[in-house]
Amino acid sequence: MTKYTFKPKDFKAFNVEGLDARMEALNEYIRPQLHELGEYFSDFFTSQTGETFYPHVAKHARRSVNPPKDTWVAFATNKRGYKMLPHFQIGMFEDQLFVMFGIMHEAKDKATRAKVFERKFKAIQQLPDDYRVCLDHMKPDKPFIKDLTDDDLKEAIQRAINVKKGEFFIARAITPQDKRLKSDKAFIAFLEETFDQFLPFYSA
């Protein structure tokens, strides 16, 4: 029995038609692991940063018609919410598991907070080759950093700083069949390795 990881069939919850039926599938196949990951990594971030982190598992409570295309657990230092703060995420679309750190368009003091990515521009470029950026958390698209020109990357960061709807995340994504999802041990190691790369951007 695995506690934290996801099997390829779990991702098929996103193929279930209808809001109620999909929510039922998410509750059965995905949310239990998200809650477990929430407990594990809120302790991880608290120990790594010295600040108290809280897990926020997506509830999708505002939805009345369209079923969610993704779901996640987010980590932030506010018990009541995460969107207003820089935060970490573990989440899923139908075809990927993603891990991210960054700032949503709803963040308070977004322009100031997003400047960490401007200051640490070289560090972003020096992330390993399989690291990506996400410029819209609602969409699965996450281009590899290595495929972006300096100007592309600078423009993306400036958009997060200057445009109301702009956001910027550094990210990593794997497919449902990835070997790092085969066991809890491999999955947790992958997540810890990823968050270790993200943490300098949080503490900067």
Swiss-Prot record:
SUPFAM superfamilies the record matches: YktB/PF0168-like
A Pfam family matched in the record: DUF1054
Source species, domain of life: Bacteria
Similarity comment: family membership: Belongs to the UPF0637 family.
Name of protein: UPF0637 protein SAB0972c
Taxonomic classification: Bacteria, Bacillati, Bacillota, Bacilli, Bacillales
